[in-house]
Amino acid sequence: MHHVQQLINGQFVQSNTDEWIDITDPATQEVIAKVPQTTNDEINQAVAAAQTAFETWRKTPITTRARIFLKYQSLIRDHMDELAEILTAEQGKTIADARGDVFRGLEVVEHAAGIANLQIGDFVENVASGVDTYSIWQPLGVCAGITPFNFPAMIPLWMFPMAIATGNTFILKPSEQDPMVTMRLVELAIEAGVPEGVLNVVHGGKATVDAICDHPDIKAVSFVGSTNVGKHVYERASQSGKRAQCMMGAKNHGVILPDANKEQTLNQLAGAAFGAAGQRCMALSVVVLVGAAGEWIDEIKAKAESLVVSAGKNDKDLGPLISPAAKARVEHLIGTGVEEGASLILDGRGITVEGFEKGNFVGPTIFDNVTSDMQIYQQEIFGPVLCIMRANSLDEAIELLNANPHGNGTAIFTQSGAAAHKFQQDIQVGQIGINLPIPVPLPMFSFSGSRGSKLGDLGPYGKQAVQFYTQTKTVTARWFDDEASRGVNTTISM
């Protein structure tokens, strides 16, 4: 049985813990590896190694740091197929989707390789006679990242490349449910030249999360995951004086106007609602049909019925949920939708895949006539379940969306520029897709979820990522001419 190792001070080592967590193939329930609950002593060793390495790493030339990530992105490309296969085995998403997971992280690594153009301060000459002022963006120190199960390649690559490229050292805690692809990415980072102690990896559940939040030498924590855990991390990390960013739960709505291109809209809706078995924080889990678009129900159902559920080992449309507990939760919420009066027009419960009868499978599920007081609307289901709602006008749809506490993402499908402009201006959501089912985050733009979906004023990606992992130091300088003197100045004037 494979035992997942830790990375401490440049060495891949097995934990001394007595507590090991099973990693299972979600299509078969086979235990494929075990991951440790890292001990407190081992966490302290990792932080100490990062603290020591920081003193050298922060002074390493920025071009040297950039070259490491140039090599790293090349290694990821060379190992793309291997990484996708590992990801599918432990997480369950299809091979094609797994490649996308890795590729979206790769884009952030490429962005980190351009750090010399990103970590640039400001300079103003002659702010006063003979006085110059400049600001520099310096690294914070030891930073940490806590990542979820649903994107075990992309989200770790959101975090440690930008943190390390800006001169910090890093403690990474991958999801205990699927850490193996993350560890393979870490191995490639070490191969690319990341020095000892600059990147460290610890494992486990709540005990490890709390230790990271509490450790006095960790200066910043980045988190992606559920709302409950995100609130816990933000509060606990903030109380110990850390900078924190928490990307949390979502209830993303797509608004369809009657003038939308029907075929393209239906295809994008089905992909965004049911892809990755709905286990995406950017999934479109609610569609609001405006006016005559309410007649599209049969076509929406037909698109969902055309999707093929598989074990993830091929290029079918969606794989299993991550665990039996996740499957049970999704099926329970489907049951509450029926009990509370929604119309179940497509039921994905009870589906089986030949040869994988023990898999955590739930097929595409659609509810019509959903209202805002139902649990299936109020909770993030995190499964392949689409809720259909109706609105008489765009104004009514906007009012419905703005009343929802989440603010991660939304989309509008229309051929009207005026309607799209009104939507993007009036909607209180951080990320908007126009004829796109919420755009995939790109590294040059910030991941800008808002309201109940985000805690912290800076997000991952883009300029905000550089700002999150740095602090500004302002220097005001005057060099005296030895022959010149104005005498004592007791005012605030320069």
Describe every region a protein language model picked out.
Residues 228-371, 434, 483-485, 490-494:
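ALDH superfamily catalytic-core signature
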Residues 32-118, 130:
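Glycine-rich loop-to-alpha-helix module at the N-terminal edge of alpha/beta enzyme cores
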